[in-house]
Every structure is written in structure tokens, then in C-alpha cells.
UniProtKB/Swiss-Prot annotation:
<feature type="topological domain" description="Cytoplasmic">
    <location>
        <begin position="487"/>
        <end position="488"/>
    </location>
</feature>
<comment type="function">
    <text>Required for normal axon patterning during neurogenesis.</text>
</comment>
<dbReference type="GO" id="GO:0005886">
    <property type="term" value="C:plasma membrane"/>
</dbReference>
<keyword id="KW-0217">Developmental protein</keyword>
<feature type="glycosylation site" description="N-linked (GlcNAc...) asparagine">
    <location>
        <position position="232"/>
    </location>
</feature>
<feature type="transmembrane region" description="Helical">
    <location>
        <begin position="466"/>
        <end position="486"/>
    </location>
</feature>
<keyword id="KW-0812">Transmembrane</keyword>
<dbReference type="GO" id="GO:0007413">
    <property type="term" value="P:axonal fasciculation"/>
</dbReference>
<feature type="signal peptide">
    <location>
        <begin position="1"/>
        <end position="21"/>
    </location>
</feature>
<protein>
    <recommendedName>
        <fullName>Protein unzipped</fullName>
    </recommendedName>
</protein>
<dbReference type="GO" id="GO:0007411">
    <property type="term" value="P:axon guidance"/>
</dbReference>
<feature type="glycosylation site" description="N-linked (GlcNAc...) asparagine">
    <location>
        <position position="35"/>
    </location>
</feature>
<feature type="region of interest" description="Disordered">
    <location>
        <begin position="380"/>
        <end position="453"/>
    </location>
</feature>
<feature type="glycosylation site" description="N-linked (GlcNAc...) asparagine">
    <location>
        <position position="317"/>
    </location>
</feature>
<feature type="glycosylation site" description="N-linked (GlcNAc...) asparagine">
    <location>
        <position position="374"/>
    </location>
</feature>
<feature type="compositionally biased region" description="Low complexity">
    <location>
        <begin position="380"/>
        <end position="400"/>
    </location>
</feature>
<keyword id="KW-1133">Transmembrane helix</keyword>
Length: 488
């Protein structure tokens, strides 16, 4: 009976796991045209766009989809999104259309079918500008940044024709644009489905993506509750100070060493990997320059001048040890994207993790004084007693070879020589200013997103899955159920 109860409980647990586990839509790469000077062109994988399989259960999925136009009816106006479906083994572009509470893809194909299973073009990072660019057959080839669809064509559209009604007023019901594709054969043409028939046009619009050429990261704040700092004392350099003269004198040397300064600022969905990025940290006059999502290492060097006074024929060993620190922490910040041909930037709040390794401080250590000749330690002054036949006690001083025994260890001095790079990192300083939690609303739109409804360009934003809260609640419930099951 007990075994049956366990089996039933296990079955229920597996069913709940299937129900509560968030399903992630499949994603596929997007290719764009990047070389307008060649006939064939060069295809490059987009760092900000993806094709994502449509999930009718995800009510928030389409908030980051690329718009292809508007659908107008007497009852409602709603955006159409760029989609694709495989027909006879070839990907065909189209636009979405609402049927009740779900969407279908209306393919730009002579079969003119409506498909339930399709991919939607998603601007996941929205730090790449996506917009429709006017095209005509006398233009020089395929526009740079055009988004490829199928074997050798690019996503295009043409405005749907409007007809005056009986009162002479021009109105339009349905899709304001017919989506299709640009065929670059010869001078090129845009093919769409219009009135359920294929039509070709010498002009229209082509969907293009403009990626940023650099980033800037500002307003950085660490989450101090989750900051981890590890320290490790490392030997940097060891040197011998020796007096080869015949008198008590000062000896000095320069100690040189190198160390690595590493920094990695994490990655983020939709942000181009490897793009030049300037990091503006608090109290840093000059921003650090890295490549986004790549580890950046600098080889740094420092010099320390060390001196002391020694007796003839003696020496000491001096060692510099460094406190090497590794800091890891979640952080929030504002990422700015910059584009060629535009003075405006697009900014977005992001959250990621930073990891830094740096030399925080340098300490001096030195050995006891020893003889250069045989390496034995030079003794210090001591007092002993000897007893004579008259039992008189005399204080005497014992000594070894010259020089006279030293009374105390020498003072060793160290000072900086040249530019110094070690010291507490600026991120450590921000820990005193950071709140205990820096969570941001990932759904916020970019602060400088265009509010002009007539400007058909998709800008800034980071794709998120609103099912995250459901997943957290589901995880808690699964933990509870698992605990109950194990107790049976």
C-alpha cells in the first residue's frame, strides 16, 4: 500500500513539473546583408535579431516582435508582425493576423495559406535599430543590413492599394502593407500577394537592421549583499641588498614587477558580443575600454625604490608581496548604444555580473642581516657573566668577527618609483554607496525611444519572459511537493 502511494505521488510530481516548468520558445539565427559592394554580398549573423517559434500560451511574447504594418478593421486596429513559415522546404515571409485571441501567419505565397505553426522575428535586445527603408529597382543592389529570408531574397513590403468608397472618401480596411520579399535578380523586384494573387513591384520597402558600432556603460551600481571578494597574498619580487664597501653605508635598489589587471562585465541578451565598449566608473577620470562580453586583460608594471643602511660584508633579502583581489558581483547600469550616421544614442538599463582581478596593495618583507661570506646571521649585542677565583662578577661583551655586532635590525624604507597602478579598485568604493538591492524593471522601454507613431522604427529594450514570476512560484511549489514526497 505504501509503495502504491509513493508511485502515485511520484506520478503527480512529474505531471506538476511538466505543467509548471516554463517552456522556452525555440530560437533561430537571423542573417543580414552586410556587403553592398559585391554581387553576392556577405551574410552576417545578427547579434540582436532572432526568429522565435510562436507560442500562443505566452501572452507577452509579441511585445518584442518586429512590426510589419497595421491591420485595420471597423472594430479594432492592431499591429501585424513579421513572420515566416516553411513551404516546400523554403522559408517564406509573411505577416501575422489575429483570429480571436491567437495569431496566425499569412504567408506571402501563391498558396496564400494561414499557418498556426510559424516563427516571429524578434528584436530581443532592441539595441539594434530595425526599420523599413524605401527601395526602387534603380537602387544599387540590396541595402546593407537587409534581413534575409529563404535562399536568396530579403524581407520586403508594398503598401496595399486603397479605393474610395461611394462617397469618394479613401478608406482602407485590412492590412495597410502586403509583406513579401525582395528578389535581387537583375535590377530586382518586390513580390507580394495582393488580392490572393502574386504581384511584382519596382519599388517598395525593405526591412533593414542597423547595429550599433560601440557602447558605453554608465551609472554602475553593485549589489553589495551578493558581492564576493577573495584576497590572495602573492610574492611579486625578491632581491638582495648587500654592502660590498668597507664602511657602514646606505644600499639601495629598484624592485620591478608586473601583474595582470582583469575585468569582465558579463553579457546580456541582444547586446553584440565583442563590440568596443567604454566603462565609466565612479571617480575614474578616464573610462576603461573593453570589448563587450569578452575578458579584458592588461599587463601592468610598477617600480619600488628600497634602501637601508648596512655594515660592510653584510646583506639582507627584501621581498615584495601583493594582496591580489578577485571581486565578483551582480550590478546594474545603463548601457548606451551609438550608431553610424546618427548623433543620438539609445540607452537601456541592464543587469549583469562583473568580475575583476587587481593588485590592491603591496607590502615589504625583509630577512635578518647575514654575512655575505658564509650566509650566517649577524648576531646582536648580548651580556654574559664570568666568575673569577675571587667570585667577582664582571660584565663582558662577546663578539664575533668584524664588524661589531649590531644593536638592532636595520630600518628598510620603500617608496614608489614612477606611475603606480595598484590600489583599491573603484568598484570597492561603490559598495559603500550601493543600496542592498539594485533590481530593475526589465520591462521599461528605452528612455529615448522615439514616441513618433509615424516613425516606423523599432528601438531599444531587452527581451524578457514574463513567465519568470510563474517559474519562481512554481519552483517553490515543486520544492514543497518534493519534500512531502520524500517524507512518505
Amino acid at each position: 500500500m505504501t509503495s502504491n502511494s509513493c508511485l502515485i505521488s511520484l506520478g503527480l510530481l512529474l505531471v506538476l513539473i511538466q505543467i509548471l516548468a516554463p517552456a522556452k520558445a525555440a530560437e533561430h539565427s537571423v542573417f543580414t546583408h552586410k556587403n553592398a559592394s559585391s554581387v553576392l554580398g556577405q551574410l552576417v549573423t545578427s547579434s540582436t535579431l532572432v526568429w522565435e517559434s510562436y507560442d500562443p500560451k505566452d501572452a507577452t511574447q509579441l511585445q518584442f516582435a518586429v512590426e510589419g504594418g497595421k491591420y485595420v478593421t471597423e472594430d479594432e486596429h492592431y499591429p501585424m508582425y513579421v513572420c515566416r513559415v516553411p513551404i516546400d522546404g523554403i522559408q517564406v515571409s509573411g505577416h501575422t493576423e489575429k483570429i480571436l485571441q491567437r495569431h496566425v501567419c499569412l504567408a506571402a505565397h501563391y498558396k496564400h495559406g494561414k499557418y498556426d505553426n510559424f516563427d516571429v522575428l524578434m528584436n530581443k535586445g532592441h539595441l539594434g535599430k530595425v526599420g523599413w527603408r524605401h527601395w526602387r529597382k534603380f537602387d544599387a543592389g540590396v541595402p546593407v543590413g537587409a534581413i534575409r529570408i529563404g535562399d536568396d531574397s530579403y524581407i520586403g513590403r508594398h503598401r496595399a492599394p486603397s479605393q474610395p468608397n461611394k462617397d469618394g472618401v479613401v478608406t482602407h480596411w485590412g492590412a495597410d502593407f502586403n509583406l513579401g520579399h525582395l528578389e535581387p535578380v537583375g535590377l530586382g523586384k518586390i513580390r507580394v500577394i495582393e488580392a490572393e494573387r502574386e504581384k511584382y513591384y519596382d519599388d517598395g520597402e525593405v526591412l533593414v537592421e542597423t547595429e550599433p558600432f560601440r557602447y558605453e556603460l554608465r551609472d554602475i551600481k553593485l549589489d553589495r549583499l551578493r558581492t564576493d571578494i577573495q584576497e590572495n597574498m602573492t610574492e611579486l619580487v625578491t632581491r638582495k641588498l648587500e654592502n660590498l664597501e668597507d664602511k657602514y653605508s646606505t644600499v639601495e635598489t629598484i624592485l620591478s614587477y608586473t601583474f595582470n589587471y582583469n575585468q569582465y562585465w558579463g553579457s546580456h541578451e541582444g547586446v553584440a558580443r565583442g563590440l568596443p565598449t567604454k566603462i565609466f566608473e565612479k571617480d575614474e577620470a578616464v573610462p576603461a575600454e573593453i570589448n563587450w562580453a569578452l575578458k579584458h586583460t592588461e599587463k601592468r608594471s610598477e617600480n619600488k625604490a628600497v634602501h637601508t643602511k648596512l655594515w660592510p660584508g653584510t646583506a639582507i633579502n627584501v621581498t615584495l608581496r601583493g594582496n591580489y583581489v578577485t571581486l565578483e558581483a551582480p550590478y546594474s547600469g545603463k548601457l548606451f548604444a551609438f550608431y553610424y550616421g546618427s548623433d543620438e544614442s539609445v540607452s537601456r538599463k541592464i543587469s549583469a555580473e562583473v568580475r575583476k582581478s587587481y593588485l590592491k596593495e603591496v607590502k615589504l618583507e625583509f630577512s635578518p642581516v647575514y654575512w655575505i661570506e658564509n650566509g650566517t646571521l649577524v648576531p646582536t649585542t648580548t651580556t654574559t657573566t664570568t666568575t673569577s677565583t675571587s667570585t667577582t662578577t664582571h660584565a663582558t661583551t662577546t663578539s664575533t668577527n668584524e664588524p661589531t655586532p649590531i644593536n638592532e635590525p636595520p630600518l628598510v624604507h620603500m617608496k614608489d618609483n614612477g606611475v603606480q597602478h595598484s590600489g583599491p579598485d573603484t568598484l570597492e568604493k561603490t559598495l559603500h554607496d550601493s543600496p542592498s538591492s539594485n533590481e530593475l524593471n526589465s520591462h521599461e522601454a528605452p528612455e529615448n525611444m522615439s514616441s513618433d507613431p509615424g516613425k516606423d522604427v523599432a528601438l531599444a529594450g531587452f527581451g524578457v519572459n514574463a513567465a519568470g514570476s510563474t517559474f519562481i512560484a512554481g519552483s517553490a511549489l515543486l520544492t514543497l511537493l518534493l519534500t512531502i514526497f520524500l517524507s512518505l
